[in-house]
């Protein structure tokens, strides 16, 4: 008797669109060559009771009868993180924290767990990438830890769900979502269907049991969280932890927040004993700035509700090639090309035979249009070899 063919479907890696056959372009997000083939998950009776435990009879409620007086935010005791979250953690929220491997995501969340446990909160840290011994070693490096932090090294989401319902913690950390799986979903951990199923279950746990869940997600080479784009749509808040691998500064940026602004940014410094908050980023950004040096300008950018001073560096030199080079770090490349074209058109600065290198010192990435004036002055300063007064601050579009 011939074996029955295993049924498969195709998922879009970007948005999670499902199709019975392979498509060159996704009808949902219009991405090309984004479909992957995965087996269809079979329904298994009597799966984890967590979903049913969080499922309650839905009853329509008048909006006027809904009260929010008891929805107090929980402070992480990390002021820079509270700033990005909009004032603290919202109970029952689902937060996605993305970033490059080794950037410090786990360190940041482990420090948050320590602060929450010191305030009497029950915390469950679920790790699918490290052993108990490794987590203990990292915790000892960060300092004194409370005994109230529970650690679970597991990747089976059904076991994790049961542990959450038994313990009923205030905050859960999932590190990372790409390692979680369910046995009844017939695909490898990190696949589109596994990530989508895991996020769906965690969302129901967060909303049904009023437990705040932090999800750690790795990013792709394009700088977005690996997995289906629907992952970012399902969560309440999306935070990106960024930074230059060669610099000590780290930046926590919100790209989605249902409970606050997405314009805020948190600044940290990576040290041997963990992350340290930078309450005055301008002071740190201008450390080591050379005085009376051509091509170096202090510019001002508004990040959220506070101004930040940064050093804009430019190097303009004669090119040895037919096509001059244009590079930028920390700011938009196309914006730099636009400004160079405006300078050539309006003030007659001919850079057709010159290479131009633009850099925002400190590893910070700024898309603020007010940085335009700093870029223009830095390029002029380098081209004319004239230093700008170190006490001069420029900003303007």
Language-model features, listed with the residues they occupy:
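Peripheral, non-AAA+ core regions of ATP-driven protein-machinery
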Residues: 3-14, 18-83, 90-98, 103-114, ...
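Conserved Rossmann-like nucleotide-cofactor binding loop
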Residues: 130-131
